[in-house]
């Protein structure tokens, strides 16, 4: 693979029709329909733009992927692929795919159904690796919709090419952070332009509310206030699907005495922190009224708009309090529930919990199951934060977590939640983006009817990606990585630190050698235009304690052993991929090389995550030591660890240079490209020359 410039990944990520898809040795089986250049794509004159776009997309697909030139005509008496509407189909976005000798019909319930039907035909031919299709007559329905994602191209950036990529990945709704009319956290955005262009690709657009809302619903001017914000927004964007709300960005001056009644940054009394939670982190008794105010204001301008409220911020609250909140929750508002957060587990008998988005939680936590069950019983429609587009905070600056067997476990539990509690709407990623991958291909096939068995589908995908000879080895490699994710450590200090940025994470010497009484935390260097940038990176590694897990000093030895096991399994997966590589046909090899390259980068991140825990334990033992001789031995270990981490960072440079998506995350921008890895090396070298050398001098004082 060649070296890429920063952001060059964008030229790859939006490619949906791939040269070399067709197997030159493929031959039709008995009874298969063969599409050749005698066929025509039929798009009726005056067709909806989405149907016309489907015709153009299919024409490009056959030209690029199948090496066939097919014309588009409004009618044809000969062999043809016909695009049509069939309004009698039951569900929106559904389509019928009928293939018979000389004719293939894609009939959508609506124009969006035609768009997804076009992709469905492409998927069949992609798996066949040839323009051959079996006779069939099948109605396809989406089991989950909406499937919503933030941009994987750049925060709130949706060029046409990326909208097209979303469609082909089986996703159906864009999510745009919204701070005001045509405003996002990174500046101006013509939101109506996004809405209209997305519509042309069969996609909806959901607003993620970062809007003013600090008003109590009982205040005399409450209606006027909420209408000035939310009614105004939907007067500007009447075609938006709806709005998403979440406690942390929807705080209000609650009168619930269990809370501070203030914003979390203002919850102080004479500078002393109030131990009560602030309203955004508690199921306040008056929160349902606030939600109803927002709903009424939205629906005044857009009667059919979805209003979604996320209870993520109080996952830790006991079930009875959460249930009481839901009893008063507006029934025509959707409740959003996070799959993974709060899942409790024990590692070597030590209690811990998942603190944010993590594939470690292959199975759901009690918060998700109890909240979904209670919402459904109360007649409230549940929405899942599912992360089923493939990314999490496990490794914050990679395009997806390449552990498909573990994702399949999650998919099966989510599907059971759909059957049991109508959890049939997904927020498929947060702002860390998405990427077309084995994970999106699994989701596209599994979250529709007829539903494919995900384990068999994974085998099909592996054969399609890597060829029949290499597929078993690649599947075994993925299985090792999936097993490895069961040994990951999903704590806040890890997901806001070393695992968020990877091997560029700084190693700060914890004893504070200072003449200016300064603090040790340093600002991680990020682009000034970044949505969050350094604000969501904690550089001074330390345990972030909470009541759901044992303290860090008690957890870390077991977590280090767990990460060592993770690294061992990960390296087994790498070895299997290296063994598979020579068996992969040349036309498929780049995908495998990129998968392996990402696996090697993740290995570096695992090493950093393990080393920083050792670093913290050694630093704290050093601070606690009362014996200079013992302290000097500890300092030797710290110095050796620093040097090893420098080499680990240096080893990651080739991996990020070959794939410019590694080390980047939409809301932080670049955090682990070559520059940041070299910055980390300089930072640790500075610690060796400065703090560690000075502390050695201190210990040798006479």
Name each region found by the language model.
Residues 44, 108-109, 177-178, 208-212, ...:
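Active-site-proximal beta-strand/loop segments in catalytic clefts of secreted hydrolases
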Residues 1-142:
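Contiguous, structured surface segment used for ligand recognition
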Residues 51-54, 58, 114-117, 159-162, ...:
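Stable alpha-helical elements in mature extracytoplasmic
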Residues 77-80, 85-165, 173, 188-192, ...:
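Conserved structural scaffold segments of CAZyme catalytic domains across common CAZy folds
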Residues 135-152, 210-213, 383-393:
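N-terminal small/glycine-rich loop or linker at the start of catalytic domains
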Residues 46-50, 88-89, 155, 181-183, ...:
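Short acidic, S/G/P-rich loop/turn micro-motifs used as interaction or catalytic elements
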Residues 2-5, 11-21, 37, 235, ...:
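Substrate-binding groove of N-acetylhexosamine-processing glycoside hydrolases
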């Amino acid at each position: 693979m060649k070296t890429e410039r920063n952001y060059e990944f964008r030229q790859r990520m939006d490619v949906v029709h791939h040269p070399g898809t067709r197997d030159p040795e493929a031959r039709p089986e008995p009874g298969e329909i063969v599409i050749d250049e005698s066929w025509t794509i039929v798009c009726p004159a005056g067709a909806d733009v989405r149907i016309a776009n489907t015709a153009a997309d299919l024409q490009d697909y056959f030209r690029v992927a199948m090496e066939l030139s097919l014309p588009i005509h409004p009618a044809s008496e000969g062999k043809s692929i016909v695009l049509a509407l069939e309004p009698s189909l039951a569900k929106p976005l559904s389509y019928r795919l009928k293939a018979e000798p000389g004719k293939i019909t894609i009939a959508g319930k609506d124009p969006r159904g035609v768009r997804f039907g076009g992709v469905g035909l492409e998927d069949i031919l992609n798996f066949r690796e040839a323009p051959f299709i079996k006779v069939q007559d099948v109605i396809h329905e989406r089991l989950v919709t909406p499937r919503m994602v933030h941009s994987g191209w750049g925060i709130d950036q949706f060029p046409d090419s990326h909208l097209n990529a979303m469609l082909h990945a089986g996703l159906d709704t864009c999510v745009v952070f919204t701070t005001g009319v045509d405003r996002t956290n990174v500046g101006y955005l013509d939101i109506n332009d996004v809405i209209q262009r997305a519509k042309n690709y069969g996609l909806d657009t959901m607003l993620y509310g970062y809007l003013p809302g600090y008003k109590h619903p009982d205040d005399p001017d409450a209606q006027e206030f909420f209408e000035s914000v939310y009614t105004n927004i939907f007067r500007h964007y009447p075609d938006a699907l709806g709005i998403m709300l979440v406690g942390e960005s929807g705080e209000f001056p609650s009168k619930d005495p269990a809370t501070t009644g203030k914003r979390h940054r203002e919850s102080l009394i004479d500078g002393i922190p109030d131990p009560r939670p602030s309203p955004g982190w508690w199921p306040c008794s008056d929160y349902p009224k606030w939600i109803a105010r927002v709903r009424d204001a939205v629906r005044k301008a857009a009667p059919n708009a979805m209003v979604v409220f996320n209870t993520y911020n109080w996952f830790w609250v006991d079930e009875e309090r959460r249930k009481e909140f839901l009893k008063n929750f507006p029934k025509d508002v959707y409740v959003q529930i996070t799959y993974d957060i709060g899942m409790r587990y024990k590692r070597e008998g030590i209690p811990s919990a998942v603190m944010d988005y993590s594939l470690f939680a292959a199975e759901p936590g009690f918060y998700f199951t109890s909240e979904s069950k209670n919402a459904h019983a109360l007649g409230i429609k549940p929405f899942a934060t599912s992360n089923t587009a493939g990314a999490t905070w496990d490794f914050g600056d990679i395009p997806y977590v390449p552990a498909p067997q573990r994702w399949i476990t999650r998919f099966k539990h989510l599907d059971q939640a759909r059957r049991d509690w109508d959890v049939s709407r997904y927020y498929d990623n947060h702002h860390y983006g998405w990427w077309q991958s084995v994970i999106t291909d699994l989701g596209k096939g599994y979250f529709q009817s007829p539903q494919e068995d995900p384990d068999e589908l994974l085998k099909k995908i592996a054969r399609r990606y890597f060829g029949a000879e290499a597929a078993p080895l690649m599947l075994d490699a993925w299985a090792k990585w999936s097993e490895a994710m069961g040994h990951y450590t999903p704590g806040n200090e890890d997901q806001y630190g070393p695992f968020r940025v990877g091997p560029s994470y700084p190693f700060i010497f914890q004893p504070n050698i200072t003449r200016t009484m300064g603090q040790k935390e340093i600002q991680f260097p990020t682009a000034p235009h970044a949505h969050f940038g350094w604000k969501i990176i904690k550089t001074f590694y330390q345990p972030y304690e909470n009541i759901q897990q044992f303290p860090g000093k008690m957890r870390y030895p077991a977590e280090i052993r767990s990460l060592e096991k993770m690294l061992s399994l990960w390296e087994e997966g790498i070895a299997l991929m290296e063994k598979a590589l020579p068996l992969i046909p040349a036309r498929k090899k780049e995908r495998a090389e990129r998968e392996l390259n990402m696996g090697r980068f993740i290995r570096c991140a695992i090493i950093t995550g393990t080393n920083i825990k050792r670093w913290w334990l050694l630093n704290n033992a050093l601070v606690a030591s009362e014996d200079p001789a013992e302290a000097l031995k500890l300092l030797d270990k710290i110095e050796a660890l620093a040097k090893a981490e420098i080499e680990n960072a240096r080893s990651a440079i080739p991996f990020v240079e070959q794939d410019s998506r590694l080390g980047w995350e939409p809301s932080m921008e670049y955090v682990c490209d070559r520059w940041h890895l070299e910055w980390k090396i300089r930072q640790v070298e500075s610690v060796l020359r400065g703090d560690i050398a000075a502390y050695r001098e201190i210990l040798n004082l006479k």
